[in-house]
Every structure is written in structure tokens, then in C-alpha cells.
From Swiss-Prot:
Its EC number is 3.5.1.2. Pfam families: Glutaminase. It comes from the Bacteria. Substrate binds at residues 92, 143, 195, 218, 263, 281. It is an enzyme of class 3 (hydrolase). Belongs to the glutaminase family. This is Glutaminase. HAMAP family: Glutaminase (MF_00313). Keywords: Hydrolase. InterPro entries: Beta-lactam/transpept-like, Glutaminase. GO terms for biological process: glutamine metabolic process. Homotetramer. It comes from Synechocystis sp. (strain ATCC 27184 / PCC 6803 / Kazusa).
Length: 327
């Protein structure tokens, strides 16, 4: 049925970050402004080949030329480009932080009863994958895993659950995210049949109690919005966790990102580059880069490739990977 005769989807190998073929370590502060500018121009040209998502009307109407980049570490910004005051929704970039929230509040032993930690080679919204796995989500970076986790945020209502998560995230990361009600209305205007099927299958198999509550909470979380400074602070929280967050908890989240943060291309990309990433269909990539000082890459550019990952941010990461292989 797709997972093997003797396979148990709940058998989870306790994770560490998988090792890339050659760990990319570089001093990004040594890169000249001229080199950054050359890479940014080339990446933005590649983005002309991407497409805007059509299944969320408001995202299909954004300016495909929008671009913003911050790369830096706990000591500050190394390089900045584009319009960093642009606002955008997190969409699937919220997933690592939902995973972090659940691990922080519930712990791994509870969480592994609800979601798995294996990569998937099917699309992020695959109902077929969930059916093959008996309703047990493959990992927390695909829609089934995130919808499942959203169903377990404390709160009696959708609004209370979203507010509980948002308050925690803004406080912990010291950012100023907000719920974009116009985008949420746009999401509701064109219901997603795959996500609906996923939510009902999760409920039928007992992984969530209420399909509607889980799905609508997930929709609100995806519509949390901010600017590049907020995205950078979220990355800093993963790279340099401060109490009460535990380093082993953020390490577990980053290990999942390495396996599944870019969906089908995740493991191959990580093994080639050493970069740990999470993308969102709004045009975001948040990446954790190994360096003498743990580095954060936060980039916004709306056009997507066929897998649903933003073209320009991926191109920039490829340029950085090539740089690190030579230095």
C-alpha cells in the first residue's frame, strides 16, 4: 500500500540532522557587496520563469517583482536587498514554528503519537500519502502534519487557538506578526478540497477530534503575516534559542526541516548544500546556514517553481552553496 508490507508508519527513527555530502561552512561576511548584487540580479532574472499560486486569489494578484532579502546572524545583518518593508503571509513557513510550539508544550513522546518524522516524495498536499499511511501524517512540514498539530493547540475556539499560538510566537521570537484577515477571507473564498479531505481523514482515523476546528485553525496560522525583520527573528530563534526554549527542541525542528522543508526536493537539496530550509507558497524561504556564527537567510520573492518553492530564493541559496564549495 505504499509503505511496505512490514512497514509501520509510526516507527519513527529518533532524529538528528542528516549529514550532507559536504557540510557547507563559510564566512558570509567575506562576500563583497558587488558579489551579492550580482547574485541577486541573477536570481531575480530566474524568477521570471516562476508562476504565482492560483488557488489563493490574493496571492495570485501580488506583484511578481516583489523582492526582499536579509542575511545575517546574531551579531546583525550581513547583507540586505530589495524592499524589506514589504509585508507577506507566512503560509507554510509557519509549520516549523507550529512544530516547535507543540514540542515545547507537549514534548516528543506525545507528539510522535500524532505525527511522523519521515520524508515524503509526494506533494505537500497529498491525500494519497495520508491514505497509504493509514491517516498518520508523514511529517510536520506537509499539510497533513500541520493540520493535525493545529488541531491540538489549546483553546475552545479557532480564534482562541490562533491567538494562543500567535501570542507565544511573538513573545518568544520578539516579532510582531499579525493575522491578515483579508488573506484569510481570500483563502475561504476558494476552499481547498485536498486540505478538507486531509482534515476529515485525520478525524476519521482519530488523529484530531474535530476536522473543521483543525483545518480552520491551520488556515488562520498560515495567514499570520509580517515583514522581513519578523522572518529573520524567527530564524534567529531556531539558530540561537534562548530560554525557555531548549536547544535539543530547536535541533529536532531543524532536523525535520532538513528532511521535508522543501517538500520532495528537501533531502537532495540539503545533502548537496548543507542548508536547512522551509519554504512557503507566499514566496518565502527561511534558511539556517552553517557558518562560524550560525547564519539566517530570509528571502521573499513570490514566483514559484513546479514543486511550490520560490525560484529566486532557491537560486540565491544555490549561489551561496557554490561559493561555500570553493572557499
Amino acid at each position: 500500500m505504499g509503505i511496505g508490507v512490514n512497514s509501520d508508519p509510526k516507527v519513527v527513527h529518533h532524529q538528528s540532522i542528516p549529514k550532507p555530502n559536504a557540510m557547507a561552512i563559510a564566512n558570509y561576511r567575506a562576500i563583497t557587496t558587488k558579489q551579492w548584487q550580482t547574485w541577486v540580479e541573477a536570481a531575480r532574472l530566474q524568477a521570471l520563469n516562476g508562476k504565482l499560486p492560483q488557488y489563493i486569489p490574493q496571492l495570485s494578484l501580488v506583484d511578481p517583482g516583489n523582492f526582499a532579502l536579509d542575511i545575517g546572524d546574531q551579531n546583525g545583518i550581513i547583507y540586505e536587498a530589495g524592499d524589506t518593508d514589504l509585508t507577506f503571509s507566512l503560509m507554510s513557513v509557519v509549520k516549523p514554528f507550529l512544530w516547535l510550539y507543540i514540542l515545547h508544550h507537549r514534548g516528543w513522546q506525545w507528539a510522535e503519537q500524532k505525527v511522523g518524522d519521515r520524508p515524503s516524495h509526494l506533494p505537500f498536499n497529498s491525500v494519497e500519502q495520508l491514505e497509504q499511511d493509514g491517516g498518520y501524517p508523514r511529517n510536520t512540514m506537509v499539510n497533513s502534519g500541520a493540520i493535525c498539530l493545529a488541531g491540538h493547540i489549546p483553546g475552545a475556539t479557532i480564534e482562541q487557538r490562533c491567538e494562543n499560538f500567535l501570542t507565544w510566537l511573538n513573545h518568544t521570537a520578539q516579532c510582531q506578526l499579525w493575522l491578515d484577515q483579508e488573506l484569510l477571507a481570500s483563502v475561504h473564498s476558494l476552499p481547498n478540497p485536498r486540505n478538507l479531505a486531509i482534515a476529515h481523514l485525520l478525524a476519521a482515523k482519530g488523529y484530531v477530534e474535530d476536522a473543521t476546528l483543525a483545518l480552520e485553525t491551520y488556515n488562520q496560522l498560515c495567514c499570520l503575516s509580517g515583514c522581513l525583520k519578523d522572518l529573520f527573528k524567527l530564524g534567529l530563534m531556531l539558530q540561537c534559542p534562548q530560554p525557555p526554549l531548549q536547544p535539543d527542541t530547536t535541533a529536532r525542528v531543524k532536523a525535520t526541516m532538513a528532511k521535508a522543508g522543501l517538500y520532495e526536493m528537501s533531502e537532495a537539496f540539503f545533502r548537496r548544500t548543507g542548508f536547512i530550509c522551509k519554504s512557503g507558497v507566499s514566496g518565502l524561504i527561511l534558511a539556517c546556514l552553517p557558518a562560524p556564527s550560525p547564519t539566517i537567510f530570509a528571502c521573499y520573492s513570490p514566483p514559484l517553481n513546479e514543486e511550490g518553492n520560490p525560484v529566486a530564493p532557491l537560486a540565491l541559496l544555490e549561489f551561496l552553496a557554490e561559493f561555500t564549495s570553493r572557499n
